[in-house]
Amino acid sequence: MERIVVTLGERSYPITIASGLFNEPASFLPLKSGEQVMLVTSETLAPLYLDKVRGVLEQAGVNVDSVILPDGEQYKSLAVLDTVFTALLQKPHGRDTTLVALGGGVVGDLTGFAAASYQRGVRFIQVPTTLLSQVDSSVGGKTAVNHPLGKNMIGAFYQPASVVVDLDCLKTLPPRELASGLAEVIKYGIILDGAFFNWLEENLDALLRLDGPAMAYCIRRCCELKAEVVAADERETGLRALLNLGHTFGHAIEAEMGYGNWLHGEAVAAGMVMAARTSERLGQFSSAETQRIITLLTRAGLPVNGPREMSAQAYLPHMLRDKKVLAGEMRLILPLAIGKSKVRSGVSHELVLNAIADCQSA
């Protein structure tokens, strides 16, 4: 069992990583006997894990209600968020309740925002079931829903009480979802840890076949890196922005193509290549390093070009609504070397459009 602590003073919390955690009531600490829980999950995951998690919580003496949400990024919306509030109020649940997010990034982000908002804030626990949510979205307290004009535009920074990563969940993950998660894994190597990127080049095949020790190390290393960044910059005023490599481009793809048509990791993968091409055009990054990124993403089964039907010009309106924009100016996360990156502003729109076009025509 691996245990990592996100160090945030009185709001610090553990990330527990192991197989078989859904069999152990202690996995869901700080929940105690007599407490009330609203378990939030999705239509796909409910048949797989709802009864199991409910059973282990009830074994610990916890009173469990549940709400099942529709699947897909398009349902990470204010309308679906309202169904969670309605379920909480109908029971009813008070300020002493705990929300448990059992699912991928959509369930985790939406449940976290519900917890941040319900009666001005209640406790919640992240139980991520996809690789993407295990290595990224469940850690760090970013919670949100989407708006038709932009992804994650309505939300809050709100930390969970704990994160429970049961590696056995990956056995039921569709291959496309596994690949999507690997995009965020590869991101950590590009922005922060060149040695980890090298390890991924050597061990990607083991990850694709869900080799236990390789996957446990991979998730642990990603969570360590994320925990270090969040501890240093919880509210994304500096260092934490680096975790958005590829996201400014990727969010544009998701919004333009319709949420759910491109998985988040797929859009981020193409966006990371666009960021690398932008850095190349600025003379800050070598084409050989870009090719290493492209090769690893391709081996993972991820796209390295944007949608053919989306023109370079179509990216700009979305990118100019990005949350990192300051004084109307885009701020891009650009790689300087494998394992090193920076936030860059003042890049001309023409250069960015040319970098996007490089990826459209490749």
Swiss-Prot record:
Keywords: Amino-acid biosynthesis, Aromatic amino acid biosynthesis, Cobalt, Cytoplasm, Lyase, Metal-binding, NAD, Nucleotide-binding, Zinc
Molecular function as annotated in GO: 3-dehydroquinate synthase activity; metal ion binding; nucleotide binding
Binding locations of Zn(2+): 184, 247, 264
Biological process terms in GO annotation: amino acid biosynthetic process; aromatic amino acid family biosynthetic process; chorismate biosynthetic process
EC number: 4.2.3.4
CC terms in the record's Gene Ontology section: cytoplasm
Listed pathway(s): Metabolic intermediate biosynthesis; chorismate biosynthesis; chorismate from D-erythrose 4-phosphate and phosphoenolpyruvate: step 2/7
InterPro entries, A to Z: Dehydroquinate_synthase, DHQ_synth_AroB, DHQ_synth_fam, DHQS/DOIS_N, DHQS_C
Enzyme class, spelled out: lyase
UniProt key word Nucleotide-binding: yes
Catalyzed reactions per annotation: 7-phospho-2-dehydro-3-deoxy-D-arabino-heptonate = 3-dehydroquinate + phosphate
UniProt binding sites for NAD(+): 71-76, 105-109, 129-130, 142, 151, 169-172
Gene3D superfamilies: 3.40.50.1970, Dehydroquinate synthase-like - alpha domain
Signal peptide region: none
Cofactor(s), by name: NAD(+); Co(2+); Zn(2+)
Subcellular location: Cytoplasm
Co-factor binding comment: Binds 1 divalent metal cation per subunit. Can use either Co(2+) or Zn(2+).
Function: Catalyzes the conversion of 3-deoxy-D-arabino-heptulosonate 7-phosphate (DAHP) to dehydroquinate (DHQ).
UniProt family annotation: Belongs to the sugar phosphate cyclases superfamily. Dehydroquinate synthase family.
NCBIfam families in UniProt: aroB
Protein's UniProt name: 3-dehydroquinate synthase
